[in-house]
From Swiss-Prot:
<dbReference type="GO" id="GO:0000463">
    <property type="term" value="P:maturation of LSU-rRNA from tricistronic rRNA transcript (SSU-rRNA, 5.8S rRNA, LSU-rRNA)"/>
</dbReference>
<keyword id="KW-0694">RNA-binding</keyword>
<dbReference type="Pfam" id="PF00270">
    <property type="entry name" value="DEAD"/>
</dbReference>
<feature type="region of interest" description="Disordered">
    <location>
        <begin position="546"/>
        <end position="581"/>
    </location>
</feature>
<dbReference type="GO" id="GO:0003723">
    <property type="term" value="F:RNA binding"/>
</dbReference>
<dbReference type="GO" id="GO:0033677">
    <property type="term" value="F:DNA/RNA helicase activity"/>
</dbReference>
<dbReference type="GO" id="GO:0005730">
    <property type="term" value="C:nucleolus"/>
</dbReference>
<feature type="compositionally biased region" description="Basic residues">
    <location>
        <begin position="355"/>
        <end position="364"/>
    </location>
</feature>
<dbReference type="GO" id="GO:0003724">
    <property type="term" value="F:RNA helicase activity"/>
</dbReference>
<keyword id="KW-0378">Hydrolase</keyword>
<keyword id="KW-0539">Nucleus</keyword>
<dbReference type="InterPro" id="IPR011545">
    <property type="entry name" value="DEAD/DEAH_box_helicase_dom"/>
</dbReference>
<comment type="similarity">
    <text>Belongs to the DEAD box helicase family. DDX56/DBP9 subfamily.</text>
</comment>
<feature type="compositionally biased region" description="Basic residues">
    <location>
        <begin position="554"/>
        <end position="568"/>
    </location>
</feature>
<keyword id="KW-0347">Helicase</keyword>
<dbReference type="Pfam" id="PF00271">
    <property type="entry name" value="Helicase_C"/>
</dbReference>
<keyword id="KW-0547">Nucleotide-binding</keyword>
Length: 581
């Protein structure tokens, strides 16, 4: 649930907030956010959570109000808790999310619902970029709500094992948001450890929220749920009408060529989110596009968390129209063959556990970062899979960033045929070897869900005129230029991150001057590439040659200060020559 109102497709006009008998302070905050009616998932989950005290397992699409479905009951219970009203603070609720970006997003929403609570309820985000001293000082105040990634929470618990800073025995609510992503990020081991800290047998209410519900949830349901109510919002039909999916078969270099043509000629109207499979790939594409005057910004795990959060916020405010995001989840999902998993799901359980433990060790590197799922990118018109993901599940997560909350959207994926692999070494990518195999799985998976992915054929005759200058620009983006750009970007963002953390807290009006889409010039700057000659444009986009603009009948008069042309003797250089003795 974003801070804006949910889509009309998900709103339940037949129900009202008054029917839930919520605390007046909470109703006032909800009204201030502009939520006139609860969404379908909220209308189903909130009564079950408040009146029947049931555990909730909910499956609903992005933009349907899942966050509000668990945050609203949590805050209502805290506002009506006599212990909280008396000022006796204890940790009452744990909210677990897969990424730092999502934890910050949830905290912002919680704070907006607590605006009329008179500071009786405190909420903290453990996954924020805070020092141990700051975390300890926040925990000493016994916040009622803790938002964190599983790994960060376990880290804090283990560090303070012999201290009285954090005690989870008073917890009455556990929420795991984006459950499938939490599991795919390798947090299962952390959740198993968390079980020993929680009072599971003492009226612990659990919310498990996700866009998909599958067999992976059974283990968590057994561990944390006692009497769950499973809610499934059947919204595939409404989503199907809003999302259009295409794939285009292309060569390794033509990916860059087509990206240049698409963005330079503004073939996509609105904001675009481009996914690449590694950090170098993102900087190569950024440096390539910059030479044509196409401004874009980068989002990857190397950047400081404060900068990443600011980039997402500015993108949502329409400051940037083009964002290149590195989806590094492919690094560990590629090891798992989806087809084998479907065929032998119940076989080799012991070896599967071994693979899971090995996989989780590799995932520790990137567990705090994620953009393909959960992060609230608003009003994305198009998702461009510049590099095809390595699993059909990752594809679903990526395209879920567009056509959200009932709005229309498009997804375009570049697919590399197997015969084209390795022909252009500089533009090649190792994961592209499996593109056709992954595409078959994606088409199969989407057809099961009632979606259609259509092939798209670019008119290469129209594009061919841009090839020469594209090749010229691509040659300028060397590996050295990429390395220097990464260093330069990291230095800039470290400075920006420090400013965001300190100076801009006191001077929010100056925050607008901080931009993340500044040019990272390659070694060779070619300014002429920023202009597209008229002869390269398609005929429909060219200006009418007959319309040459206003041509005056008489030439302009000579400027007053301009010297007149010499005449007579002065005009002849031989006659005007003076010999000086």
């Amino acid at each position: 649930m974003s801070t804006t109102s949910a889509s009309e497709a998900y709103v339940d006009d037949n129900s009202s907030w008054d029917s839930f008998h919520l605390d007046a302070r909470l109703v006032q905050a909800i009204d201030q956010l502009g939520f006139e009616h609860p969404t379908l998932i909220q209308a189903s989950a909130i009564p079950l959570a408040l009146e029947e005290k049931r555990d909730i397992i909910a499956k609903a699409s992005t933009g349907s109000g899942k966050t509000g479905a668990y945050v609203i009951p949590i805050i209502h219970n805290l506002l009506t808790d006599a212990e909280v009203e008396s000022g006796n603070h204890h940790i009452k609720s744990i909210i677990l999310v897969p990424t730092r970006e999502l934890s910050n997003q949830v905290l912002q929403f919680v704070e907006k619902l607590l605006v009329y609570s008179n500071n009786r309820i405190n909420a903290i985000n453990l996954s924020a970029n805070l020092s141990d001293q700051v975390v300890n000082s926040l925990l000493m105040n016994k916040p009622e709500i803790i938002i964190s990634t599983p790994a960060k929470l376990i880290q804090v618990l283990e560090k303070n094992a012999n201290k009285d800073l954090i005690d989870l025995s008073t917890v009455r609510n556990l929420t795991i948001d984006e459950v499938d992503l939490v599991l795919s990020y390798g947090y299962l081991e952390d959740l198993q450890k968390l079980e020993t800290y929680l009072p599971i047998k003492k009226n612990l209410q659990t919310f498990l929220m996700s866009a998909t519900v599958n067999d992976d949830l059974n283990d968590l349901k057994t561990r944390f749920c006692s009497r769950p109510a499973i809610l499934k919002l059947n919204d595939e039909e409404s989503a199907q009408n809003k999302l259009i999916q295409y794939y285009a078969r292309t060569t390794e270099f033509d990916k860059f060529l087509l990206a240049y043509v698409i963005f330079k000629l503004n073939l996509i109207k609105g904001k675009t989110l481009v996914f690449v499979n590694n950090i170098d790939r993102g900087y190569r594409l950024k440096l390539f596009l910059e030479q044509f005057g196409i401004r874009c910004c980068i989002l990857n795990s190397e950047l400081p968390i404060n900068s990443r959060l600011h980039i997402v916020e500015e993108y949502n405010k329409n400051v940037y129209n083009l964002l290149i995001a590195t989806d590094e989840t492919n690094d560990f999902t590629v090891e798992k063959d989806e087809q084998q998993q479907e065929e032998s799901q119940d076989k080799k359980a012991s070896s599967a556990k071994t693979k899971q433990s090995k996989k989780s060790k590799k995932q520790k590197k990137d567990t705090e970062y994620g953009v393909s799922r959960g992060v609230d990118f608003r009003n994305v018109a198009c998702v461009l899979n510049f590099d095809l993901p390595t699993t059909s599940k990752a594809y679903i997560h990526r395209i879920g960033r567009t056509a959200r909350a009932g709005k229309a959207g498009m997804a375009l994926s570049f697919v590399l045929p197997i015969k084209e692999v390795g022909k252009h070494k500089t533009a090649s990518l190792s994961t592209a070897k499996k593109d056709e195999k992954i595409l078959r799985r994606i088409v199969k998976q989407q057809s099961k869900n009632g979606f259609e992915i259509k092939p798209y054929q670019f008119d290469m005759k129209q594009v061919e005129g841009f090839r020469y200058r594209s090749e010229d620009a691509f040659r300028a983006v060397t590996q050295t230029a990429i390395r220097e750009a990464r260093i330069k970007e990291l230095k800039n963002e470290l400075i920006n991150s420090d400013k965001l953390k300190r100076f801009f807290e006191e001077n929010p009006q100056d925050l607008a001057s901080l931009r993340h889409d500044k040019e990272l010039h390659p070694t060779r700057v070619q300014s002429h590439l920023k202009r597209v000659p008229d002869y390269l444009l398609p005929e429909s986009a060219r200006q009418d040659p007959k319309k040459i603009g206003f041509v005056p009948f008489h030439k302009n008069k000579v400027h007053k200060n301009r010297k007149k042309k010499p005449t007579g003797r002065k005009a002849d250089p031989l006659k005007s020559f003076k010999n000086r003795k």
